[in-house]
């Protein structure tokens, strides 16, 4: 396996900065603010698919954001287990057809559009209509932790889980989360903020170890806004400590210790967007049941060879083999 030095380093690496002392108190207080079940609309859509019921869910998130999600539930007399899917940065939730694969195994699926990105969720007070990308990572970092864009997204996810868990068709004790890149980060956030999530699959998770990202000089599209903030707003890095201290409250590695359910992670060793070292800053802070798989030849790209089967097995308990069956 190539790059043995990196493989050795990632076994123990936990990130450049420690968790703020009041981190859990901050998030517990933020969750308390949204602990009441929000008003929501769940509208059924008839797509002439006889085996499932399809719904569009909308609710008001923090700071007047409007959150939209697609919901697919297999028709069943029993309560169904459910998977929350989260999409990549600047993207949108799954198409309806993408969600149907899991219903064959008896699982419901919810796919949320992140506010202000390419789907139907809206960014509220910041921009009531349309796409507000880019700048989501850095937004609010100058004003303070209460103003962070991703703080609102994380609370949207908490509320989403609460709404879905309250539905009579859903088995609230069998909830999972799944995603890649930003989606992998948000799947972990779902489990960290809401212990109802019992199982998480994260593929090359984003939003981790911001200090290391800055030191690496990551100018990929995903992290470009962090680089550009310092290049064009603070070239002497006079505010670096304050910015890093604020971003610590949305750093996924700092949420890892809160996760109680099982976690599986997949990493491409050639990833130059969400560097493997930053992903393992999350993994090595997990205290729950966990496992990972590394793909040495893969970068931050579609992982279509056996990975979808592996994820399906992890989430649904199936036993699809990882070889060509003749």
Give the ranges of each region predicted by the language model.
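N-terminal targeting or regulatory segments adjacent to alpha/beta-hydrolase or S9 domains
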Residues: 1-52, 324-326
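N-terminal cap/lid segment of alpha/beta-hydrolase-fold proteins
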Residues: 33-77
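Short beta-strand/loop motif that positions the catalytic acidic residue
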Residues: 258-259, 265-267
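Acidic catalytic loop of the alpha/beta-hydrolase fold
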Residues: 269-274, 301
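Histidine-bearing beta->alpha loop at or near hydrolase active sites
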Residues: 294-312
């Amino acid at each position: 396996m190539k790059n043995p030095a990196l493989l050795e380093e990632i076994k123990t690496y936990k990130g450049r900065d420690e968790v703020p002392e009041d981190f859990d108190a901050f998030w517990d207080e933020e969750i308390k603010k949204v602990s009441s079940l929000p008003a929501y609309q769940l509208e059924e859509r008839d797509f002439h698919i006889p085996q499932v019921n399809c719904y569009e869910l909308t609710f008001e998130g923090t700071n007047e954001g409007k959150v939209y999600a697609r919901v697919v539930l297999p028709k069943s007399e029993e309560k169904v287990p459910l998977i929350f899917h989260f999409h990549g940065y600047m993207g949108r939730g799954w198409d309806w057809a993408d969600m149907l694969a899991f219903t064959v195994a008896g699982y419901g699926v919810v796919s949320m559009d992140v506010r202000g990105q390419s789907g139907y969720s809206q960014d509220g007070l910041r921009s009531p209509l349309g796409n507000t990308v880019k700048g989501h990572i850095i937004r609010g970092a100058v004003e303070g932790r209460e103003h962070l864009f991703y703080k609102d997204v994380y609370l949207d996810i908490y509320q989403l889980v609460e709404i879905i868990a309250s539905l009579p068709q859903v088995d609230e004790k069998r909830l999972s989360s799944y995603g890649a890149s930003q989606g992998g980060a948000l799947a972990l956030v779902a489990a960290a903020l809401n212990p109802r999530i019992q199982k998480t699959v994260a593929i090359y998770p984003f939003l981790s170890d911001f200090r290391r990202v800055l030191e690496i000089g990551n100018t990929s599209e995903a992290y470009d806004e962090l680089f550009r903030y310092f290049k064009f707003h603070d070239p002497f890095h006079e505010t670096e400590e304050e910015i890093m201290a604020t971003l610590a409250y949305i750093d996924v590695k700092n949420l890892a210790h809160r996760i109680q359910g099982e976690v599986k992670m997949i990493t491409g060793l050639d990833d130059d967007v969400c560097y493997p070292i930053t992903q393992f800053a999350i993994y090595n802070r997990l205290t729950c049941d966990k496992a990972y798989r590394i793909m040495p030849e893969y970068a931050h790209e579609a992982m279509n060879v056996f990975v979808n089967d592996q994820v399906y097995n992890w989430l649904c308990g199936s036993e699809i083999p990882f070889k060509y069956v003749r």
